């Protein structure tokens, strides 16, 4: 199902903002492209001085398709590069940092875990608008952003606001393609997010160069896995919050993470996520590998989780425990939707196949 957001009708002040900046445009002649498609762009005229370089320039207006928590496709039109952005998760902050767009961030939603070392200073300098449990669309609107970036599930009616609700406030939305739970996604989806943001913000050269680096990293992992794994598939259990013999799992319905496992020739032994699983469930799952996802809020229990599993006699025959194939990864480096996932992919590749 697809719907097109309409021009705002809230008054001359909002209308003026739409006409001068980013907005949803009611123009049937405007070409519509998905976030993974080519957006119309122009190169500098050969007769101009700018044509001496290979710089790509976005031709505005452009229309990008995106999806909120209902996974209905919504079109977002940008009449110019956004000047003011709100980031809604750690991976969107990191994307802005790597694309040289840090100065466009006018506010962010507080993140759950410590920021990455390379962008910690940036995060510490940002205006924290609130946390994900209490933030409201009115607070977001008060920061006067042109656009907000985050995962699809964030954009729901209620506190944060659906895409149409935010559009009515004069705010465009870009939901990360890598966070789309309605379809199969992969590490390529993160690369697509990089190039699409490059088009939206008119930093295509930087985005394309960064995307090339990520593609090369992905190809290196793929070649290593193909050479090392052959036809062998590893059964993996993705676990978190291990306490006194119970734990949480993330299942194959976590689409990006499932795509990461597929790239490593691995299969998630759990179809869906769940909580309050027991040691008996772990024995029954019989994984070759356990990926243990750590989080700051579980720091105390996480510190002893792996050792506790190894000391459980009932788990002695589980291959992951018997062969010491348990690896810890930070939540935001595995369960988020950004470039840190590439670090984790490489770490997992080394752990599994070295």
What are these model-predicted stretches?
Residues 115-116, 152-161, 171-196, 230-256:
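Extracytoplasmic ligand-binding site segments that recognize negatively charged/polar headgroups
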Residues 91-94, 111-114, 147, 153-157, ...:
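Solvent-exposed loop/turn segments at secondary-structure junctions
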Residues 111-116, 248-275:
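Alpha-helical, coiled-coil/dimerization segments enriched in small aliphatic residues
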Residues 184-201, 208, 291-354:
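Structured C-terminal subdomain patch of bacterial secreted/periplasmic proteins
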Residues 11-18:
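Bacterial N-terminal signal peptides
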Residues 77, 136-147, 278-286:
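Short helices/loops that flank or line small-molecule/ion binding pockets
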Residues 84-143, 147, 151-153, 266-269:
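A short, structured surface patch at a secondary-structure boundary
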Residues 2-4, 8, 20-94, 200-238, ...:
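Bacterial Sec-exported substrate-binding components of ABC uptake systems
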């Amino acid at each position: 199902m697809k719907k097109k957001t309409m021009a705002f009708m809230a008054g001359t002040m909002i209308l003026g903002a739409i006409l001068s900046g980013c907005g949803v445009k009611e123009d049937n002649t405007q070409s519509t492209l998905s976030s993974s498609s080519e957006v119309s762009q122009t190169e500098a005229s050969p007769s101009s001085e700018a044509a001496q370089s290979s710089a790509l320039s976005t031709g505005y207006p452009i229309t990008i398709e995106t999806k909120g928590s209902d996974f209905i496709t919504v079109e977002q039109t940008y009449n110019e590069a956004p000047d003011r952005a709100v980031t809604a998760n750690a991976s969107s902050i990191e994307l802005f940092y790597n694309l040289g767009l840090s100065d466009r961030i006018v506010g962010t939603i507080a993140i759950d875990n410590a920021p990455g070392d390379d962008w910690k200073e940036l995060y510490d300098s940002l205006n924290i608008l609130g946390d994900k449990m209490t933030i409201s669309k009115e607070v977001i609107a008060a920061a006067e952003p042109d656009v907000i970036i985050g995962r699809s599930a964030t954009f729901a009616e209620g506190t944060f606001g659906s895409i149409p609700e935010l559009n009515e406030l004069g705010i465009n939305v870009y939901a990360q393609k890598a966070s789309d739970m309605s379809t199969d996604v992969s590490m390529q989806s993160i690369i697509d997010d990089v190039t699409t943001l490059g088009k939206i913000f008119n930093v295509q050269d930087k985005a394309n160069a960064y995307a090339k680096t990520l593609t090369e990293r992905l190809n290196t992992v793929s070649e290593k896995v193909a050479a090392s794994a052959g036809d062998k598939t590893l059964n993996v259990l993705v676990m978190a919050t291990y306490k006194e013999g119970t734990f949480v799992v993330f299942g194959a319905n976590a689409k990006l993470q499932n795509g990461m496992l597929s790239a490593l020739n691995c299969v998630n032994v759990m179809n869906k996520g769940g909580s309050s699983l027991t040691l008996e469930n772990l024995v029954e799952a019989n994984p070759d590998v356990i990926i243990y996802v750590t989080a700051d809020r579980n720091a105390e229990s996480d510190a002893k989780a792996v050792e506790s599993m190894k000391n459980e006699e009932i788990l002695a025959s589980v291959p992951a425990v018997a062969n010491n194939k348990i690896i810890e990864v930070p939540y935001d480096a595995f369960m988020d939707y950004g470039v840190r996932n590439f670090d984790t992919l490489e770490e997992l590749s080394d752990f599994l196949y070295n």
